[in-house]
From Swiss-Prot:
It comes from Staphylococcus epidermidis (strain ATCC 12228 / FDA PCI 1200). The glycine cleavage system is composed of four proteins: P, T, L and H. GO terms for biological process: glycine decarboxylation via glycine cleavage system. CDD domains: GCS_H. It holds the Pfam family GCV_H. One of its GO terms (cellular component) is cytosol. Residues 22-104 form the Lipoyl-binding domain. This is Glycine cleavage system H protein. Keywords: Lipoyl. The glycine cleavage system catalyzes the degradation of glycine. The H protein shuttles the methylamine group of glycine from the P protein to the T protein. Its cofactor is (R)-lipoate. The lineage of its organism: Bacteria, Bacillati, Bacillota, Bacilli, Bacillales.
Length: 126
């Protein structure tokens, strides 16, 4: 199972890619695998403010609905609107096409609380 080393990870199975104080966030391959076929993705509005741990949307699969949690605090600067029409991207390409939101980071000290790829792999038993 892919756990790209260039990303950070949350214990709630979100991946985080940091570029110039903006965090791109999606769910991991492990998470989409556990959920099964994704049929609907609900995401927030641009400019919404999030605190670490806030719910920012949900992913609905044929099995269940799973909440999405903000791995860091900040303002949403972009939302992947393609997922509204193509939720299957979450299954097909969780680390590329299926990014969910981009968050302008308000407290970069929170990044230290995220897991490395090795720590995340250990957590999921890989």
């Amino acid at each position: 199972m892919a756990v790209p080393s260039e990303f950070k990870y949350s214990k709630e199975h979100e991946w985080v890619k940091i570029e110039n104080n903006v965090a791109t966030v999606g769910i991991t391959e492990y998470a989409q695998n556990e959920l099964g076929d994704i049929v609907f993705v609900e995401l927030p509005e641009t400019d919404d403010e999030l605190n670490e741990g806030d719910t920012f949307g949900s992913v609905e699969s044929v099995k269940t609905v799973s909440e999405l949690y903000a791995p860091i605090s900040g303002k949403i600067v972009e939302v992947n609107e393609e997922l509204e029409d193509s939720p299957e991207f979450v299954n097909e390409s969780p680390y590329e096409k299926a990014w969910m939101v981009k968050i302008e980071i308000s407290d970069d000290s929170q990044l230290e609380e995220l897991l490395s790829a090795d720590q995340y792999s250990e957590m999921i038993g890989e």
